[in-house]
């Protein structure tokens, strides 16, 4: 045992070797020492446990293993992946892909000084939300708009500004929870207001709102149940009905759309999603929605509505805490400008482009992917093109599915499939699919930059 342990080199010895010196120059002394200690400890533990040297880890080749480990630890964690899950707006994979115009605008904002809060024509300071507000007003018909860093922040700012220390009435069937345990009741608590639930889970009437109103009521609130749907014996109150009640009793109505859409998705043959423009036209005081979901832009929370209410939001101390930086604003501005030319949206917005692909187009992709994979995989794996059902994702239209095609992979054992999935994850750009029906599904509707995927698979 002692003889085996004696072959383990010291950290100091590794540092003095030429290969060790080169690694220190490349990765730094601290990182090298940490990895060296880890490799040495692992080798020592193996000897103590098995009373032998590991076959795949010779004691005289530790520097090679250290180099491999250092290379892996230095890789950027948020690396590019190919999304073949069938979920287009996959929250865990970054949601919307930016348009080329948005990427260019954001890159320019990073490289140069910009007129972030400067009115060039007037030669004086301006507000960073001004341009975004003007675009949103033109697109939605709202009087004014402001931007924060996500939709949860938009809801928080709205509640903190208008309902702190007071009551907000919401239907019990609209108390949503989204990914990451974000809950409307929790946001209300953080904003310092009291939630008043009305109605039941499946049925809420206008009389329920009316009965709950008192001198402490600050807001009537509608929350779009974007990530679930209640069906069957149901009844809900529309924004228009709430607005009429609010006007009668002198209370504003605010609507959280969650995902939100600026275009009628049905015109592209897609399931309909509530339009921001419709909520504004109904008289709702403020509407909140996300920029990185159906809108197809960077992460941001957008609030549109009455000018006086937007001004109150801008004046609240939380607005500065939650404001967006120049890069996000540049990307969002470029994204919104696409909506001024709605006929070109499917060309410029990657999200909409993916959503509107024809089955014939997907079949061509599926055939190419099947051919590329068949050259790469051994005889254990059987590849087949099958019909699939994709989804939009990020809480948008949770019960709706989009017709799609996928390359499915089966194997003699589940272990073989898991090994293949792991191999896909170890590629230069990991391939992320999904498991179902004892198959690995690679759905073509959700994958962007398809040609690059094929090039990677066919690299020698």
From Swiss-Prot:
Instruction: Choose one Gene Ontology CC annotation of this protein and give it.
Output: cytoplasm
Listed EC numbers: 2.9.1.1
Q: What is this protein called?
A: L-seryl-tRNA(Sec) selenium transferase
User: What gene is this protein translated from?
Assistant: selA
Which source organism?
Answer: Haemophilus ducreyi (strain 35000HP / ATCC 700724)
Reaction equations catalysed = L-seryl-tRNA(Sec) + selenophosphate + H(+) = L-selenocysteinyl-tRNA(Sec) + phosphate
UniProt keywords (A-Z) are: Cytoplasm, Protein biosynthesis, Pyridoxal phosphate, Selenium, Transferase
Task: State if Cytoplasm is listed as a keyword.
Answer: yes
Under NCBIfam families, the record lists: selA (TIGR00474)
Pfam families linked: Se-cys_synth_N, SelA
Functional pathway? Aminoacyl-tRNA biosynthesis; selenocysteinyl-tRNA(Sec) biosynthesis; selenocysteinyl-tRNA(Sec) from L-seryl-tRNA(Sec) (bacterial route): step 1/1
Required cofactor(s): pyridoxal 5'-phosphate
């Amino acid at each position: 045992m002692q003889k085996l342990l004696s072959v383990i080199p010291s950290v100091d010895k590794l540092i003095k070797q030429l290969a060790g010196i080169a690694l220190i120059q490349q990765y730094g002394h601290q990182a090298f020492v940490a990895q060296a200690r880890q490799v040495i400890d692992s080798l020592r533990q193996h000897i103590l446990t098995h009373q032998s040297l590991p076959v795949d880890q010779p004691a005289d080749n530790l520097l090679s293993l250290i180099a491999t480990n250092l290379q892996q630890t230095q890789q950027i964690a948020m690396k590019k992946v190919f999304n073949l899950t069938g979920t287009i707006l996959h929250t865990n994979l970054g949601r919307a892909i930016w348009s080329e115009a948005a990427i260019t605008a954001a890159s320019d904002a990073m490289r140069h000084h910009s007129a972030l809060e400067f009115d060039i024509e007037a030669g004086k300071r301006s507000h960073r939300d001004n341009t975004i507000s003007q675009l949103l007003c033109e697109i939605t018909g709202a009087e004014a708009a402001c931007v924060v860093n996500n939709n949860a922040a938009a809801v928080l700012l709205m509640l903190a500004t208008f309902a702190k220390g007071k009551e907000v009435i919401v239907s019990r069937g609209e108390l949503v929870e989204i990914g990451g345990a974000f809950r409307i009741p929790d946001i209300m608590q953080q904003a310092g207001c009291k939630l008043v639930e009305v109605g039941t889970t499946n049925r809420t009437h206008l009389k329920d709102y009316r009965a709950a109103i008192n001198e402490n009521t600050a807001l009537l609130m509608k929350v779009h149940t974007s990530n679930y749907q209640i069906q069957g014996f149901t009844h809900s109150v529309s924004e228009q009905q709430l607005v009429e009640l609010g006007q009668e009793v002198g209370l504003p109505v605010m609507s959280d759309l969650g995902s939100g859409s600026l275009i009628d998705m049905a015109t592209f043959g897609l399931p309909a999603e509530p339009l921001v423009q419709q909520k504004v036209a109904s008289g709702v005081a403020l509407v909140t929605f996300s920029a990185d979901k159906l809108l197809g832009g960077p992460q941001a929370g957008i609030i549109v509505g009455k000018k006086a209410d937007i001004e109150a939001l801008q004046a609240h101390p939380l607005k500065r805490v939650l404001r967006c930086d120049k890069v996000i604003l540049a990307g969002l501005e470029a994204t919104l400008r696409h909506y001024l030319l709605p006929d070109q949206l499917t060309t410029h917005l990657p999200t909409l482009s993916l959503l509107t692909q024809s089955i014939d187009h997907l079949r061509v992709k599926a055939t190419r992917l099947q051919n590329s994979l068949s050259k790469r995989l051994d005889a254990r794996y059987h590849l087949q093109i099958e019909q699939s059902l994709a989804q939009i994702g990020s809480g948008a239209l949770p019960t709706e599915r989009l017709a799609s095609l996928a390359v499915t992979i089966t194997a003699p054992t589940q272990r073989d499939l898991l090994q293949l999935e792991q191999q896909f994850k170890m590629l230069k750009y990991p391939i992320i699919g999904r498991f179902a029906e004892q198959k690995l599904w690679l759905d073509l509707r959700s994958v962007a930059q398809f040609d690059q995927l094929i090039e990677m698979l066919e690299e020698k």
